[in-house]
Amino acid sequence: MVNYVLRKMLGTKNERELKRLRPLVARVSELEPRMKALSDADFPRLTAEWKQQVRNGRPLDDLMPEAFALVREAGVRALGMRHFDVQLIGGAVLHSGRIAEMKTGEGKTLVATLPSVLNALSGRGVHVVTVNDYLARRDSEWMGRLYRFCGLTTGVIVHGLTDRERQDAYHSDITYGQNNEFGFDYLRDNMKFRLQDYVQGELNFAIVDEVDSILIDEARTPLIISGPSDESSDLYYRVNQVIPSMIRDQDFTVDEKSRTIVMSDSGVEKMEKKLGVQNLYDPNAIETLHHVEQALRAHHLYRNEVDYVVKNGEVLIVDEFTGRLMPGRRWSDGLHQAVEAKEGVKIEAENQTLATISFQNYFRMYSKLAGMTGTADTEAEEFAKTYNLDVVVVPTNKKNVRKDSEDVVYKTEREKFGALCDEIETRHKKGQPVLVGTVSVAKSEVVSSLLKRRGVPHDVLNAKHHQREAEIVAQAGRKGSVTISTNMAGRGTDIILGGNAEMMAKHEVGPEPDLPMEGEAEESFLARKQEWARRLEETRERLRGQTATEHDEVVALGGLHIVGTERHESRRIDNQLRGRAGRQGDPGSSIFYLSLEDELMRIFGSERIQGLMSRMGMKEGEQIEHPWLTKAIEGAQKKVEGHNFDIRKNLLEYDDVMNQQRRSVYRLRRMVLGFGAGVPVVEYDEEPKTRKKTRREQVFTWGDQREHVLDLIEDLVFDMVGASCPNRLSDWNLDGLSSMVKEQFGVEMKFAPPSGKAADARREIEEQVYAVVEKAYRQKEEELGIGPDGEPVLRRYEQWLYLQAIDQQWKDHLLSMDHLRQGIGLRGYGQKDPKQEYKKEGYEMFVQMTWRVKSAVIGNLLRLQLVRQETAEEIEQKRLAAQRRAMQRITETHAAAAGDGEEKPRPKQETVVRTQPKVGRNDPCPCGSGKKYKKCHGATEAAV
């Protein structure tokens, strides 16, 4: 009651926020006459002046009204588009690092230009993240006209670019790109052998378009870079041959809700007999068990034409959220190979993880993150908890008049498809455009074949026909058009009633000439380009009149009609489909046709809904519309959303452990690459509670590298002496210490029996060993001499050996962590919290890994023997050749949705875990603070 009264008096939080932003809109409008008076040349001049002012310390917030007013006028001059007042509000929300919920058709693409120009003034880059390559290209070219008018540069990151092209794109003021490409560039950069080969630069400010799709829907699937392992494909074929003999509900059970399969005792016995294995659960047969489980999942959970398609002898994943094919992406953990065996195509080698990151942890690295979408408010809590992002609902420019009908439900799919085809045919005959939304490729093909039989002309937009995507969507609002789409989320092209004259003109005229023909003179090529531009403008003008007339006719018919063939597992996706109609105050309507055989109803809501329908006395062939039913269906969707949220939360909790380790390793790697590079290494320190980031940069010299290597030697000596010389003198093992020193450092040492206090004697031995090893290090330095750059040659070998050690040990550590993750679920049976166990053991394994890195670097360094003195250039070429070899063998994948199956132990190699791990005192602390261990957790533990 109190909250209700306060809301009435003060307004909701969203209303208060909108009220707070209105003075900004008024100020921008006041500045409009001043901006109109500027010449075109004044725009880049003002931008350059503001850049200098920001460098001199002027806050961006201080410049916001002027910058927004400049961008608004630039939009008019460069694009013929003026930002509405509500778009200015959206721009301010994005600049403040929040999510702007703006309905479909409200011009989100144009809104992004406001904070992009303002934040580009910092000179530290702005990334605009889209859901596909087409939108990245389109928006960078389209909005690029506005940016260039303001004197700013634009780049685009899409699949297939070279590193040089990527560097150029990232060096632009504003960079557009697809979400996966940004994440993979980060991972690839941290596998490079020179800082100058990094492409991405700083993660300063990101604006994520369709933010709910990228940061929530796709957050279940981490990005993985992997390389081929040595495993044979024979076992996949053998297991696949015997899977058909397994009988569902007798030999195994399938839980489609949790996407898991469990074998019964009879199923296990059958597989053991068929495969000639004595005990599938024997540690030596655990790999075979894993193959069996993945083969069962491939046969009974992953379906052709729904989860993947087979094209040109290759299994291509279908993105479940957008319906697009994902060439080059593979499911991990042997699942993709199991599907290949099932479909009878060539099995590609299974890959080992080399680098991985979740979308949550990638995007949380940005200093400032913002997003925009038509549907975010329903997920506001998750955005706040996971990304520290608030959602502001921006009002529409014109009132939404779309009519949304209650769902119509039938008992069977056959009845449902018949009824919805009747609806489509009736609307088509009237001339009203219809957009049909389906949840899979297979369902879109079913609707298409039914409409063909009725003679209803239509276009199909799914993973098989995505090449014509923009063209099809652009014409979906034309009179009499029928368009079938697997998923309208993120399609990104507005459906304009009467047709899109711009897209129609481009289709009619054809693509712009981009390269001269063989032997063609430059004058001829330029003339061809000019002729193309003339024809495009001529065609555009002709079509504008045609589409304007058609627009009025379609409005009179009721606008675009949306027909949903099934409820998606997320209410947001349904709302996005509905949101395609009724843009900018246009009329429109929507209705969903459902059946009890639909996947969502069958798995999550069938019994309750069937009971409701039985009580209403529904018979075969009858339809029902009722608010109770709509609520029950929404309840089923909420169940799925809750389940998916748990999966994302689970993934994040596990990945947070890896994230701290990954950031620590990558930070160390960048420091090593920075030694002697002469360029600053930029790092961000994050305050854990607020996630506020502090930027710092540091230049590392060759002298810093020498100091660092001596620190590593000190750490190793400290560890060895500590292990051999505990607190009781009677437990000392000096012979063992001599052997360890010989093995690690290659030097002979004998130690006299200790006397006095153990601590003093131990310190004396530490100093003895360190002095001997430091002398051996200096001798190695003198032996290799001074290079042409005036620095000891040893420096470059140190750096090379250090990078090799980090990369090899990190790769092995990722494999060990994979195995730990797969088996950790069984700890629950022993009354232990699997996550806590994973965190504890993962930390211990990480500590061991850092010790192995130090041991490998120093051991190899002191044993280094050169047959021939190599130049710095030759050493550099070796590193680059190794980098090229590594990059040629990698594969980028989206993992199968985390949580798709039960976690099972799958040890390929045994990991020895010390019970009392020691971190080197000068190592980066594994907690990810960026401090040395001895000044962070090391100091705490020493005090204890």
UniProtKB/Swiss-Prot annotation:
Gene Ontology molecular function terms on file: ATP binding; metal ion binding; protein-exporting ATPase activity
Keywords: ATP-binding, Cell inner membrane, Cell membrane, Cytoplasm, Membrane, Metal-binding, Nucleotide-binding, Protein transport, Translocase, Translocation, Transport, Zinc
Residues the record lists as binding Zn(2+): C925, C927, C936, H937
Principal location listed in the UniProt entry: membrane
Region (Disordered): 894-944
One Pfam family it belongs to: SEC-C
Cofactor: binding details: May bind 1 zinc ion per subunit.
Disulfide partners: none
Residues reported to bind ATP: Q87, G105, E106, G107, K108, T109, D494
GO biological process: intracellular protein transmembrane transport; protein import; protein targeting; protein transport by the Sec complex
Basic and acidic residues: bias regions: 901-911
Cofactor(s) the record lists: Zn(2+)
The UniProt record lists the keyword Transferase: no
Subcellular location: Cell inner membrane; Cytoplasm
Gene3D superfamilies assigned to the protein according to its UniProt record, in alphabetical order: Helical scaffold and wing domains of SecA (1.10.3060.10), P-loop containing nucleotide triphosphate hydrolases (3.40.50.300), SecA, preprotein cross-linking domain (3.90.1440.10)
Membrane topology summary: Peripheral membrane protein
Main function: Part of the Sec protein translocase complex. Interacts with the SecYEG preprotein conducting channel. Has a central role in coupling the hydrolysis of ATP to the transfer of proteins into and across the cell membrane, serving as an ATP-driven molecular motor driving the stepwise translocation of polypeptide chains across the membrane.
Description of how the protein assembles with itself and partners: Monomer and homodimer. Part of the essential Sec protein translocation apparatus which comprises SecA, SecYEG and auxiliary proteins SecDF-YajC and YidC.
Family to which the UniProt record says this protein belongs: Belongs to the SecA family.
UniProt-recorded name of the protein: Protein translocase subunit SecA
Origin species: Anaeromyxobacter sp. (strain Fw109-5)
